[in-house]
Amino acid sequence: MKKKFIKMLCSIAIGCMISTSYSIKVSAFSNGNTKTNPNGEFKSLSLNSTNPYKTKYSFNDLNKLSNKEILDLTSKIKWSDISDLFQYNKDSYTFYSNKERVQALIDGLYEKGCNYTSTDDKGIDTLVEILRSGFYLGYYNDSLKYLNDKSFKDKCIPAMIAIENNKNFKLGENGQDTVVHALGKLIGNTSCNDEVVNKTIPILEQYYNEIDKYSKDRLKSNAVYNFMKEINYDISQYEYAHNIRDYKNTPWSGKIDSFIDTISKFASISNVTKDNGWIINNSIYYTAKLSKYHSNPSIPHSVIDNCIEIFPDYSEQYFTAIEAIKEDFNSRDSKGNVIDINKLIEEGKKHYLPKTYTFDNGKIIIKAGDKVEESKIQKLYWASKEVKSQFHRIIGNDKPLEVGNADDILTIVIYNNPEEYKLNKTLYGYSVDNGGIYIEGIGTFFTYERTPQESIYSLEELFRHEFTHYLQGRYLIPGLFNKGDFYKGNNGRITWFEEGSAEFFAGSTRTSVLPRKSMVGGLSKNPKERFNADKLLHSKYSDGWDFYKYGYAFSDYMYNNNKKLFSDLVSTMKNNDVKGYEALIEESSKDSKINKDYEYHMENLVNNYDNYTIPLVSDDYMKQYDNKSLHEIKSDIEKAMDVKNSQITKESSQYFDTYNLKATYTLSSNKGEISNWNYMNNKINEALNKLDNLSWGGYKTVTAYFSNPRLNSNNEVVYDIVFHGLLSHNKNSNEKVEVKEEPEIKDKDSFENVIYEKENNDSFDKANKIHKNQIVMATLDTEDYRDTFYFDALTSGSIDITIENIHGNSDAFNWLVYNDEDLNNYIAYPTKKEDNKLMGSFKVHKPGRYYILVYKTSLNKVNYKLNISDATNMAPVIKKIHEKENNDSFETANKITLDTLVLGNLDYKDVSDIYSFDIENTKDLNIKLTNLNNLGIAWNLYKESDLNNYIAYGAKSDNAIVGKCNLSPGKYYLYVYKYSGDKGNYSVIIN
């Protein structure tokens, strides 16, 4: 089973919520207010903030006040005047554990809700934030779990209705807008009923009628947005908590039609502007999400259909509607017609990312918008080499922790601008409420070009940060993000280090890591406001964004003043020593000397701010140099570094060729870990300096590192050393770069068009899986003389196979095809030879698994491309998934959807699989179970109301078990079982 985990390592949050519609959408549903620290979202909007007594309060102060005094105080202070709001400590526990006090605050909100005016919010904004802080802490802390109980949250509903019944409940003066905004936030942290929901309609109508004016008003816009987001959030949480499958049976079903219809009105605004685009997007999103609670879901569904017609192709609104059709309506329009969503998405990728660049023999691929300058693409490549060189020096390892992961090939997706980046959520399915994001499970990070007005961080800075996350996942932290041991039980255990060190390594140069002016400028000038070591070392994403800057400062402190701590931390990570790491963190967070030195280092950084710059790659990388032979370069580097017997290899990129020189360096004496490191660091830098002083300018592109320290048989310390630099420019450097057109995708499976083989695949049981119309890049050499691949044929037909020797002729290798049922006798071989290609075809007489064996027939190394294609008409486009074990009981059944092809397998231990699916409307369904191997298999269908008696079964038809049945609304279980045969694969589809 293939698992994908998202490394959501975002460099920079996109600021204003209403400036980015997709960021609104993602945070609205994925990041409910109970899961994120909400007090960083806006500055206080309370009007009456005069306070003659104090400028700041803490829960310690509030605990000394009576309930009446607290309620009076909320009218005099801003919520930001409470220093530890949303923070769990003994004082906040004391405050919120007093149920009578919390109830008094809720009662106070009711009274204030009855009495606020158009110009005086009566402190409602501050009081709401105090209440939200309690519900937030109740979500995360069992000691306050009563605050997370829905029955207690419902106690806020009378106060909400009181606010809505006040004659001043409308958009207008600042006091009114503040109250409306606060109500929306409170709904998200508590609950709502249909009355609360429907009483928000006048606000939505008012905003709709004045949209040209109000869309320019941030407070009014956020107030309206909160109603959409938080009401949907509360309903979806109820749905999740009660395992709702019949959406007609909820407290809101059929009771909030007018609310949904009012939201949907915004989706029909065809005149999109920079001010109203966000609410149109959100209207599309929430209309689709809430449609299932409408008494006639086809009404909001048809609104989404209309969006596809009225908005321009490739526009943000168009793709928002496309995604809604896919996610909320099973890729069908309101009349039941299937829409080929995958085709539209692929067209969108080609539109927004028409350029493809390759580097390092295809190990780095950049997909970019047509407005991203090609010179910047090249500079990003060289920036990666600077970051990589310093990372490996400090981490001390350049061997991948796991072989065969997706990050064997790094893919970088760069959109033209922030506006186009919003489409990434639809085109690739990943969050866009950030400046960039690395997805470790697919070895890809996404970002966008930006102007100084759009971000204080340049594209190269962001790239350096995200590239560090790639290096962390590949060389430092075992396991995939959020899945490895360091994330178990506490997924924020190393967050401060991942983000802080990523900001640190973004300052890498050829010889060191320099302070970044953009980071130092974010450190508070007031020492009391800075993170101390204890606070930083326990920081998580839920704590906001500030820990990025202080994590950077701590990494810079370790690099310059405490290399031993830096080394100890990375050693625990490389060794997967979670307990050792936790012990080191606890010790360091309480070490007064570490904290003092860290704070002193921060003070020096702040004081020297004007002396810093932002490290970026030099223009030396972009200059043209005379060609120099590998032999000459090898000789010069060996002389500069005082080594012999190095190995130098060439790698090709789109614009230039580069080289890697590898050797070992043995220390004359062992002076301890840190002294050895300092010696090697100086030695490498001295070699780079010597090369710089030679006449050939290409040496100014050289980066180098040392890693993997170890003792040899003579008890001497040995390091691996690696030098990388420019070898020569190719013709693309002097002409417009040719854009690589994406191959036409005929098979809409969600697979990459170009993949690389994963060793070891030299036997049938280790074969790599491939797909039709996929290009496989692979290599055969003296140690790897054969490769095997397999594919599953779901129907009969003719298969074409082409294998091309990239750098030689077709006499150097051969291929054969085998059927899974007989691995001793091949069934096909090449029948046509054309220059460097071997081609052939064979007839698939019945569905099943087929293997391709590629083997060498000469002593030469062979780099080849393999492609298989279907010579018959392509099968209908369908989505494919794989079963997930254990699914052998009704309780553990895999949930599937209609029109999805499920691939499963059975063997002597696993003799049955069970799947569940939901039917919303009475319909006729076809069930087809296809035997991909020589198994005796069958299926039965059960309804949830009677799991003892099946209601349908299949009949044999060729190599499939098929059946047709008429099903009424409800939940059903498909029971697939084996009655003969050893082991094999099958596919099943319900449509």
From Swiss-Prot:
Positions with a binding annotation for Ca(2+) 3: E759, N761, D784, D787
Positions binding Ca(2+) 2 in this chain are E757, E759, D784, D787
Pro-segment residues? 29-52
Region Collagen-binding domain 1: what ranges?
755-870
The segments labelled Activator domain in the record are 57-330
In this chain, Ca(2+) 4 is annotated as bound at: E883, E885, D910, D913
Q: Where is this region: S1 metalloprotease domain, degrades FALGPA (furylacryloyl-Leu-Gly-Pro-Ala)?
A: 53-727
> Could you confirm whether the keyword Protein biosynthesis appears in this record?
no
Which residues are noted in the entry as Ca(2+) 1-binding? E440, G473, I477, G479
Annotated residues for binding of Zn(2+)? H465, H469, E499
GO molecular function annotations of the record: calcium ion binding; endopeptidase activity; metalloendopeptidase activity; zinc ion binding
Biotechnological and industrial applications of this entry: N-aryl mercaptoacetamide-based inhibitors with submicromolar affinity for clostridial collagenases but negligibile activity on human collagenases have been discovered that may lead to promising anti-infective drugs against Clostridia.
Concerning Gene3D superfamilies, the annotation shows: 1.10.390.20, 2.60.120.380, 3.30.980.50, Collagenase ColT, N-terminal domain (3.40.30.160)
User: Which portions of the sequence form the region Collagen-binding domain 2?
Assistant: 878-991
Name the keywords, alphabetized: Calcium, Hydrolase, Metal-binding, Metalloprotease, Plasmid, Protease, Repeat, Secreted, Signal, Virulence, Zinc, Zymogen
Keyword Ion transport carried by entry: no
Region labeled Helper subdomain — which residues?
Answer: 619-731
Annotated active site residues, numbered on this chain, are E466
Q: Quote the entry's note on domains.
A: The mature protein has 3 domains; a metalloprotease domain (S1, approximately residues 53 to 727) and 2 collagen-binding domains (CBD) (755-872) and (882-991). The metalloprotease S1 domain is composed of 3 subdomains which together resemble a saddle; an activator domain (residues 57-330), the catalytic peptidase subdomain (340-611) and a helper subdomain (619-731).
Designated name of the protein:
Collagenase ColT
- Its source organism is Clostridium tetani (strain Massachusetts / E88)
- Species lineage, top-down? Bacteria, Bacillati, Bacillota, Clostridia, Eubacteriales
